[in-house]
Design a protein with these regions (language model features):
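Exposed, low-structure sequence patches enriched in small/polar residues
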Residues: 1-275
Length: 275
């Protein structure tokens, strides 16, 4: 079941959504049994929560629980609320070029019992706020804070992990064809792998070329650097990207679609085109 409500007036936008999933998994049995596997999953249902693009906000992404007979988990229930507000140009907070604020609250629980809408154990909760400000024609900044609480056992146990993530996204346009973007991120938590820090520098040569370098460092635990560097070229409807670096084991998400990846150090070549 899905319910959505929206309101938009005078720079204020509010979006409310709620969803209940029960036994929505559709898959081909592997080796004659019902063991769950992402390799034989026929359908994918995206999580209804903020889809982050920053490294540390995506460290433990949420995936929708669509029913798992092995762990006796029939589904999930929850929802999210989005609030957008644009401060007009010339106002006290808007200043010369305006100010945009977005806040999100999302939370999901297991189903306490099949066939009911009663919530069980907490699966995921996220409270976030981001502020976007165009200071000059050349300089724009985005500041984000996210408090995430997730259940590492996917509802089999009640224990959860809490983390706070801070992000500064700074963009500067030197010329219409040459710009840079700098990301500074920090994650603080007393659990799991403890604190993380990350940084990314991106240099763009419009309209085709882009190069970047990034590093994600587990300063509270393993003391391992997860570095990456890459270059991309885009023309017409095709984009080619080549990168090299160290990647950690975990869920890799893009556009709301997540897949489990192993830890590895190596190169990646990606070709994207549209018809």
């Amino acid at each position: 079941q899905l319910l959505e409500l929206g309101y938009n007036r005078n720079g204020l936008g509010i979006s409310l959504s709620g969803r209940r999933l029960e036994w929505m998994r559709s898959e081909i049995p592997s080796n004659g049994n019902l063991k769950s596997s992402s390799a034989n999953l026929l359908n994918y249902i995206p999580a209804m929560c903020t889809q982050y693009t920053y490294m540390l906000t995506n460290l433990h992404p949420y995936t929708a629980q669509i029913g798992d007979a092995v762990y006796n988990n029939s589904g999930e229930i929850g929802g999210q609320a989005d609030i957008f507000y644009n401060f007009k140009r010339g106002s006290a907070l808007g200043g010369k070029r305006g100010l945009k604020i977005h806040a999100n609250f999302s939370t999901y629980y297991t189903l306490h019992k099949e066939g009911t809408a009663k919530a069980g154990k907490l699966l995921y909760r996220d409270i976030s706020i981001d502020i976007e400000k165009q200071f000059t024609r050349k300089f724009k900044a985005v500041l984000l804070y996210s408090m995430q609480e997730e259940n590492p056992s996917y509802g089999r146990k009640s224990a959860t992990r809490l983390q706070n993530v801070f992000v500064a996204d700074l963009q500067y346009k030197f010329t219409p064809k040459f710009s840079t973007r700098l990301e500074l991120q920090y994650l603080t938590t007393h659990e799991d792998e403890k604190d993380w820090m990350a940084a990314l520098l991106e240099i763009n040569f419009a309209p085709s070329w882009s190069i970047y370098g990034s590093d994600m460092y587990n300063n509270g635990g393993s003391k391992i650097h997860y570095f990456n560097a890459g270059v991309s070229y885009a023309r017409s409807r095709t984009r080619i990207a080549l990168s090299y670096g160290r990647n950690r084991e975990g869920l890799l998400c893009s556009g709301g679609v997540c897949r489990l990846t192993r830890a590895y150090t190596g190169a990646n070549l990606q070709i994207t085109t549209s018809f």
